[in-house]
Design a protein with these regions (language model features):
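Sec-dependent N-terminal signal peptides
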Residues: 6-9
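Intrinsic disorder/low-structure terminal segments
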Residues: 11-12, 147
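Substrate/cofactor-recognition hotspot
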Residues: 19-160
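C-terminal motif of bacterial Sec signal peptides marking the signal peptidase cleavage site
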Residues: 14-17
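Positively charged n-region of N-terminal signal peptides that target proteins for export
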Residues: 1-4
């Protein structure tokens, strides 16, 4: 009787122990960061102005103008409003380098890529590309000047 129970236990445990191994897939761990995760420092007024001027005119702003505009920005409490006014003044000056609307519409993909690199100093994500292509398709009245203004006033542009 003991032998039968012992034999039964051995058979039971050997059957229970025989299990097909599940395949193990090795996965490489990747560190995923947001596209702008490292942009966490707010630009100072002089940094914002000099970078904005360089992005719009493709040349450096004179030190005298930089000091004058920086003092103007620092004297006003609403930074968003003053940034809009300064940007508007820059856009009305001669020498702003903006692609024409017809050139923008001719190759939207290239325009969007270059705008991201110019203002955000990074590559565009596929989701952003798809969004802008759909946006331009549904809004034919949007000009390249409007796009440049939107990028210049965006939250991401305020940080480095």
């Amino acid at each position: 009787m003991k032998k039968n129970i012992l034999l039964l236990l051995i058979v039971f445990f050997s059957i229970a122990a025989c299990k097909k191994d599940e395949p193990i897939y090795e996965i490489n761990q990747l560190q995923s960061n947001s596209y702008n995760a490292n942009k966490n420092k707010l630009k100072s007024a002089s940094q914002y102005i000099s970078i904005l001027y360089a992005n719009l005119f493709q040349k450096a702003l004179s030190p005298n103008e930089l000091v004058e505009i920086t003092r103007c920005i620092e004297s006003v409490g609403d930074k968003g409003l003053v940034h809009e006014v300064v940007l508007s003044n820059f856009m009305n000056k001669e020498g702003v380098i903006i692609p024409s609307d017809s050139l923008m519409r001719a190759d939207l993909d290239l325009f969007i890529e270059e705008t991201y690199k110019r203002f955000y100093v990074r590559d565009i994500t596929e989701a952003e590309r798809e969004y802008f292509l759909n946006f331009f398709a549904s809004h034919p009245d949007v000009s390249s000047e409007m796009v440049y203004m939107a990028f210049s006033l965006s939250n991401e542009y305020q940080f480095y």
